[in-house]
């Protein structure tokens, strides 16, 4: 070190300053990408949290819907049993039940014997005559 001249010390100083400058530029360029990467990771965590929350809400919704359907099915079964027992109690004999069935069959037979109409009563549209003019 004793043999080094001023020129070598100047060259070392310039190299040190240039190294600092290049290091500063490299840090400056990569610092933005590091910030961007950290920001992206934070956004990813936020989105994952929201997704997990939404999944939990959907699971809760379907579980609650299933319970409500079970309750609904049980209520309809109770209603059906109630109508069945009430029907047996109120109508009693099978002969009386047949009376209502026979009336229904007779009513449907009468309507089936009639020819279906494919026109409406009276004239309509362009060929309709105005009775006011006559």
Curated annotation (Swiss-Prot):
It is a single-pass membrane protein. It is found in: Cell inner membrane. It holds the Pfam family ZapG-like. This is Z-ring associated protein G. Residues 107-134 are annotated as: Disordered. Coiled coil: none annotated. InterPro entries: ZapG-like. Belongs to the ZapG family. GO terms for cellular component: plasma membrane. Residues 111-120 have a biased composition (Basic and acidic residues). Keywords: Cell cycle, Cell division, Cell inner membrane, Cell membrane, Cell shape, Membrane, Transmembrane, Transmembrane helix. The keyword Transmembrane applies. Involved in cell division, cell envelope biogenesis and cell shape maintenance. One of its GO terms (biological process) is cell division. The chain crosses the membrane at residues 7-27.
